[in-house]
Curated annotation (Swiss-Prot):
Gene designation: OFUT11
Protein name, per record: O-fucosyltransferase 11
GO molecular function: glycosyltransferase activity
Originating species: Arabidopsis thaliana
Top EC class of this enzyme: transferase
Transmembrane segments: 68-88
Main location per the UniProt record: membrane
GO biological process: fucose metabolic process
Keywords: Carbohydrate metabolism, Fucose metabolism, Glycoprotein, Glycosyltransferase, Membrane, Signal-anchor, Transferase, Transmembrane, Transmembrane helix
Length: 589
């Protein structure tokens, strides 16, 4: 049957398809189009024209909007709008605390109201709840442990981790390493500490923590060794870098370790995980969470040199706080030079201060702060509460809360930026101001000089036993300390957490009266008291908060694990504390 080929009615070939069109020649002309088909084709053509016109208008509208969008983005992201049309003042964006201090100074020092008693600062109590069953039997079944014989099931291999950062970032890595070793049924090699250019501390594990205590405390839960055995190392020519190294994703889940890490460990008998900061999710099974608790609150005890001096510092603070019943306030003040530079905040030093901070940022962090996508807004940093509180601001806040000039304050800090200038107002408001440098002799501190983590361990211990702890800038130190205090003081962090966005607004109001400021500070203290006893809801293994900041309820199970792990014994192993202190004897565990 012959197929029909239709000629193009308006073609230039007079209705003939050429051979170049890959068509076939037809002798008969095409039949004329019916009227209905002509109407349909005309309607289709008009519809296409209308659609094309609409599309053109829409695209043209977008084309006109593009320059406007680009200009808006340029103003918001590349250069502040205030830089083009004149500086726009944002309330709280300028550091005016020295001005208001001078204005209110007479009122502060003439305030005759009753001083806040340190023994009655904290009003809220943790509500007692029905204790949940501890995962004791679960631990036994998962680890194959026998607490009588301290026997463990055959291991899957050796786990090497390298912890970086400062004291408490390393502490987090150690606790996570114990948990991962338990999860993989591995033998954990004493964690290695990486040297960091910022922290500049070459300390090893044994310089900070008691290795023997660490190993013995975890006996029967996770096996700990100091080194990988020779029979393993000979396979890698005694070169640690030749050992299979795994880069684990941040906040890795239990399934990730079982699926990705365990097979490699089983195959080679040893693995190395580096870096190891935040490499385990917070949501883990109860028996893994319990290992974190045991490591943090039982196994990690500061080394003898640190614990010995720390005990002396606590004793001296208690002695100097006789006017307040041996109780004192500790303040974690992050106003060191590098912290001020990193925050990208400006105070009252003008261009000279800005230039100085630019040099420090470039020296310590290279080009991190000069990237094109990095917009530095000191004013917005301050409004959003991201600027470190100055010693003056801390002093005014505490005086407003009701702490008088008889209050003993321990300052946990490195070298303060421009100390002569910035520490003077705080010293004026609180004459009983002490640091580890003022409490210890130069000879006692000599072995610690040049080791930031060892110095931080001293601050950690003295702050841990204070009646009131004040955090000013966040970070691992206060988060770990608040969790440790919750564990130590029956669930209450006993910590002042300033509402910094609110505080900066108050401290730039030149019309504010001292009575108004005091009222706001007492409300802030009350809010810290309320939040201090809050326990996040934990459903099964769905934990979104840090076990190190909120250790309850899981870590309460530590007291049920061993009959010889008594309250007193526990205190002695929590960072080298001692039972003679009034604070320790009054702590409820």
């Amino acid at each position: 049957m012959k197929s029909k080929i239709h000629h193009q009615p308006n073609g230039s070939n007079n209705g003939v398809v050429s051979s170049n069109d890959n068509g076939c020649r037809s002798e008969s002309p095409s039949p004329p189009l019916s009227p209905n088909r002509r109407v349909l084709r005309r309607q289709r053509r008009q519809t296409l024209l209308r659609a094309s016109s609409f599309s053109l208008r829409r695209n043209l509208r977008y084309l006109l909007l593009l320059p406007m969008i680009y200009a808006s983005g340029l103003l918001m992201c590349v250069g502040p709008f205030s830089g083009l049309v004149g500086w726009v003042y944002v309330p709280g964006s300028v550091y005016r605390s020295p001005e208001i201090y001078r204005k209110l100074k007479d009122d502060i020092f003439s305030d005759n109201s009753t001083a806040l008693e340190l023994s009655s600062v904290w009003k809220f109590k943790r509500r007692p709840k029905m204790p949940k069953p501890c995962p004791n039997s679960t631990v036994s079944s998962h680890f194959g442990l026998n607490r009588e014989s301290s026997a463990l099931a055959p291991s899957s291999g050796y786990l090497i981790v390298e912890a970086n950062g400062g004291l408490n970032q390393q502490r987090s890595a150690i606790c996570n390493a114990v948990a991962v070793a338990g999860l993989l049924n591995a033998v954990l090699v004493i964690p290695r500490f990486e040297f960091h250019a910022i922290w500049k501390d070459s300390s090893n594990f044994g310089d900070i923590y008691d290795e023997d205590h660490f190993i013995s405390s975890l006996e029967g839960y996770v096996k700990i060794v100091r080194d990988v055995p020779d029979e393993i190392m000979t396979r890698f020519s005694y070169n640690v870098s030749s050992i299979p190294t795994i880069r684990v994703q941040a906040w890795a889940t239990v399934n990730y370790y079982n699926g990705e890490v365990y097979p490699v460990l089983k195959e080679h008998g040893v693995i190395r995980i580096t870096p190891f900061a935040n490499r385990l999710a917070m949501s883990v099974p109860p028996y893994i969470q319990l290992l974190r608790c045991i490591a943090n609150y039982k196994a990690l005890k500061f080394s003898s040199p640190i614990s010995t001096l720390a005990e002396k510092l606590v004793d001296r603070m208690v002695e100097k706080s006789s006017a307040t019943g041996g109780k004192y306030v500790s303040v974690h003040l992050r106003f060191e030079e590098d912290m001020v530079a990193f925050s990208c905040c400006l105070y009252e030093g003008g261009r000279a201060e800005k230039s100085e901070m630019d040099v420090i940022r470039q020296k310590s962090w290279k080009g991190k702060f000069k990237r094109r996508d990095r917009v530095i807004r000191p004013d917005l940093n301050r409004v959003n509460g991201k600027c470190p509180l100055t010693p003056l601001e801390v002093g005014m806040m505490l005086r407003g809360m009701g702490f008088d000039n008889n209050t003993s304050i321990y300052l946990a800090s490195g070298r303060i930026y421009q100390p002569e200038k910035h520490l003077a107002p705080l010293q004026e408001m609180f004459p009983r101001l002490y640091t580890k440098e003022s409490l210890a002799t130069p000879e006692e501190l000599a072995p610690f000089q040049g080791y930031s983590s060892r110095m931080a361990a001293l601050d950690y211990t003295v702050s841990l036993l204070s009646e009131v702890f004040v955090t000013t800038q966040g970070g691992n130190f206060p988060h770990f300390l608040m969790g440790h205090r919750r564990f130590l003081f029956g669930g209450h962090a006993k910590t002042v957490i300033p509402d910094k966005p609110k505080l900066v607004l108050l401290l730039q109001d030149m019309e504010m009266r001292w009575e108004v400021f005091k009222k706001e500070m007492k409300l802030m203290l009350g809010e810290s008291d309320r939040k201090g006893v809050m326990v996040p809801r934990v459903r099964k293994i769905n934990r979104k908060t840090s076990i190190y900041t909120y250790p309850l309820p899981e870590c309460e199970c530590i007291f049920h694990l061993s009959s010889n792990f008594s309250n007193t014994g526990n205190i002695l192993s929590l960072g080298a504390l001692h039972p003679s202190s009034n604070l320790i004897s009054s702590a409820r565990l």
